[in-house]
Each structure stands twice: as structure tokens, then as C-alpha cells.
């Protein structure tokens, strides 16, 4: 308050019975910006980390001279889709299973993700008539992390998922195959049975694609699945095969080009059509 009274600027959250409002304050002026639960990236206001991100972005934009209308439009149209936020809270519906794909790979990230999951599942339970919603998580961490960090990741995941499936990255970063997964699973088991800990089962499926298939085979309509990924495009491609619908980013791989288009298929189609544009698809030497 003193900062603003002296002519300073601030972005604050005004909590009301109708929801939380992001407000920009400049001196004695207070300018309402947006309801947090109406911003797509906040998942109905349950993703508090994206509420914080929205406030930071709004503050930076306002300080740079952007108008309130432009800031509102930016916040209201930004989503966590692959196109705008690849690998960060990408949401996919797979036969009515709510799948969230994210790069989370450490305990602090899992803690924040888990806190979101608690709020999101509670909101979803109030909107659903499907009965109990199970939460299944596929988790992993990089091999070059401290062993204590690997165990901690599993311990945190145990708090928030009914079933935890532990996988490993393609690059082991100096570890023996299975070593990292064993430590993460050890962390999960260390918490199972404690009051307030959800996890009742932990499994190890080392290969990422196999782990995705295993998790999805266990899920029922209405469940929430969180896939913490290493090879994002491969996972999206697998989900695409399950849904038989194109999924964003499933053809990204390591090549430059449109993330939704298969470059090999495009080349074959162009050649079959005798299209001179096929030359444009050929890699330069």
C-alpha cells in the first residue's frame, strides 16, 4: 500500500465471493483486469502457478506500456495447448480420460503439480456424475540428479496419485538401466500407508511408450492421468494412435517444420501427385 501511495505500481489479487480478480494498482488507481477462473491457462483458477504467471505477465506488459484491453486479450486467449506452451500442462481427452502432459521432473515441480491436482480433481468431482475419480501418474527424473532428489520425487508423487507408474528417460546420464526408477519407486513406497497419502500401488515400466500404454490401459472414463514426459512428441504420437485423432505436436520429432504434419507422408503425397512442390520438401544437402 505504501508503495502504491507513493505512486508505485503493483499487480494484486482481490479475493471476492465471486472469484479472484487480478487488479493493477497505480498510485491511487485500481484497475480490474480479469477473473482468474476465466483465464484458460488457470484450469478454472485451480492452477495457482499460472495465476502467478498471469499476474507477472500482466505486470510486465503494463510496465512496458501495453493497454488494459491488450493485456486482457492476451490473458484470455493464452492456453496451455501445445502450440502456445509445448510440454507444459498440455491437456488431451482420450476416450473421456483427462490426460495432462507435462515436463515435470523434480520434487518441487511435482509438489506444485500435485497441489494443482488436488484442487482440479475437487472441482471436477463437483461437476461429474461418474463417481470416484482415480488419479494415475507416470513419473520420472533425470539420471544426473542426486539420489536423495530421486527418492523425494517419488515421496511427493505418492501424496497425490492413487497409482504411480515409474519410467526412465531414454538417456540414462551415467546410470545403469533401472537404477533411477528403483529410487523413485523407493520414495513412493516410503510414504504408502501414511495418513493422507493417496498412493496404493506403484509399478515400474522403464520404456516411456510402454509406460504410457500401461497407464492408459488402467484408466477409466472420468479419471485424471498425468504423464510427465521426456520425449514429448513420441508421447503425443502414442495418444494420437489411441484417439485416432490428430494431436498437436505428435510429428515434431527433431526436424524443423509444422508440428502437426508428418514430413515423410507429405513427401510421398507430393511425389504421387507429381507436384513440383515435392522439391521444396526435400532436405537441402
Regions found by a protein language model. Give the residues of each.
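Short, basic and Ser/Thr-rich N-terminal targeting/leader segments
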Residues: 6-7, 18, 83-85
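ATP-dependent carboxylate-amine ligase
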Residues: 33-36, 40-49, 59-69, 73-285
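Acidic-glycine-rich active-site phosphate/pyrophosphate-binding loop
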Residues: 12-39, 88
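PAPS/PAP-binding and catalytic site of the sulfotransferase fold
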Residues: 53, 57
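Structured loops at beta-to-helix junctions and adjacent beta-edge loops in soluble globular domains
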Residues: 1, 16, 25-27, 140, ...
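Cys/His-rich short segments
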Residues: 1-12
Amino acid at each position: 500500500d505504501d508503495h502504491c501511495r507513493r505512486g508505485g505500481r503493483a499487480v494484486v489479487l482481490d479475493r471476492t465471493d465471486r472469484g479472484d480478480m487480478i487488479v493493477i494498482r497505480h498510485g491511487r488507481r485500481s484497475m480490474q483486469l480479469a477473473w482468474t477462473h476465466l483465464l484458460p491457462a488457470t484450469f478454472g483458477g485451480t492452477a495457482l502457478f499460472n495465476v502467478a504467471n498471469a499476474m507477472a505477465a500482466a505486470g510486465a506488459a503494463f510496465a512496458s506500456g501495453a493497454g488494459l484491453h491488450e493485456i486482457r486479450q492476451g490473458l484470455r486467449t493464452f492456453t496451455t495447448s501445445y502450440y502456445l506452451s509445448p510440454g507444459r500442462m498440455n491437456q488431451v481427452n482420450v476416450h473421456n480420460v483427462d490426460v495432462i502432459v507435462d515436463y515435470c521432473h523434480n520434487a518441487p515441480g511435482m509438489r506444485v503439480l500435485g497441489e494443482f491436482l488436488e484442487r482440479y480433481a475437487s472441482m471436477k468431482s463437483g461437476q461429474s456424475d461418474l463417481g470416484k475419480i482415480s488419479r494415475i501418474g507416470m513419473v520420472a527424473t533425470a539420471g544426473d540428479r542426486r539420489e536423495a532428489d530421486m527418492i523425494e520425487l517419488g515421496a511427493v508423487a505418492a501424496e497425490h496419485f492413487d497409482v504411480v507408474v515409474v519410467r526412465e528417460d531414454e538417456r540414462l546420464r551415467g546410470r545403469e538401466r533401472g537404477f533411477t526408477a528403483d529410487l523413485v519407486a523407493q520414495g513412493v513406497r516410503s510414504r504408502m500407508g501414511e495418513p493422507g497419502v493417496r498412493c496404493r500401488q506403484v509399478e515400474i515400466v522403464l520404456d516411456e511408450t510402454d509406460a504410457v500404454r500401461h497407464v492408459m490401459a488402467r484408466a477409466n472414463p472420468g479419471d485424471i492421468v498425468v504423464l510427465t514426459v521426456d520425449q514429448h512428441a513420441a508421447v503425443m504420437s502414442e495418444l494420437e494412435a489411441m484417439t485416432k485423432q490428430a494431436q498437436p505436436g505428435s510429428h515434431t520429432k527433431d526436424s524443423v517444420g509444422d508440428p502437426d504434419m508428418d514430413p515423410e507422408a507429405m513427401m510421398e503425397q507430393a511425389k504421387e501427385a507429381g507436384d513440383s512442390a515435392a522439391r521444396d520438401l526435400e532436405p537441402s544437402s
